[in-house]
Amino acid sequence: MAKQAKMVVDKAFSISKIDKRIYGSFIEHLGRAVYDGIYQPGHPLSNADGFRKDVIDLVKELDVPIVRYPGGNFVSNFYWEDSVGPVEERPHRLELAWKSLEKNEVGLHEFKKWADAANSEVMMAVKLGTRGITDACNLLEYCNHPGGTKYSDLRIKHGQKDPYGFKTWCLGNEMDGPWQIGHKTMDEYGRLAEETAKAMKLIDPSIEFVVCGSSNKDMPTFALWEDHVLSHTYDYVDYLSLHTYYGNRSDDSNDFLAKSDDMDEFIHTIIATCDYVKAKKRSKKNMYLSFDEWNVW
């Protein structure tokens, strides 16, 4: 017998205004996500820049306010300087995260153009696996500094006079994972993220940071990772990332539909850990969450 669900909404019991970025997404140079996904030159539905107009229209319809780029695991082997300048002069590189070849046809400028067409902001990730502070600062200077310096003038030379002004920056990706190129221990990463954030703020004090939390709650270092990383970075970052993916490998529909409860528990556990570090530091600052990877896999 079918049962009818009922929801009661009382506007007098509002909690807070919803940050529109909760509806954000991310894209990565993985499989056909970029090449043939959003970018397919020569296709009848592609625009003059090679981007699929039908995909752009769908993203606009979804009203995605912010998109994280370029990854994902991809960022740990991403050489941003290879992705700018004349396309025909860009080198091809072995892409080690997903074991493919990166031709750099879609680079920083191209993706920003796509994001503008889709009415989305760019949430830029820096490479803290195989590089570090200097590389992150150079990228920020290229993207956000007005001009008169090596990397801002290089951006201008590449045809982009005005700075991009990217506001939100991710300090690496899933650095707790042994699969990550340049994987770090919790304290190695915490110190690196702290010093990177401090240095980048000297270039652009207006930016905000997302620091890597655990790649999923089943990691053996889960919660300890958040504690140690935030103990280093709490005063310098604004968001802690959460990632999780759900599947139904056991073909159990009831269990699968209950995964939303598991996600709620995950969020509350992270909040408790953030509050613990806040108390430990005697801080008045609240740490916010960036749930920047979640889906059905």
What are these regions (language model features)?
Residues M1-A223, S231-D238, M263-D264, H268-W297:
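Non-catalytic accessory regions flanking glycosidase/transglycosidase catalytic cores in CAZymes
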Residues K217-D218, L230, Y236-A258:
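Long, well-ordered, tryptophan-enriched scaffold segments
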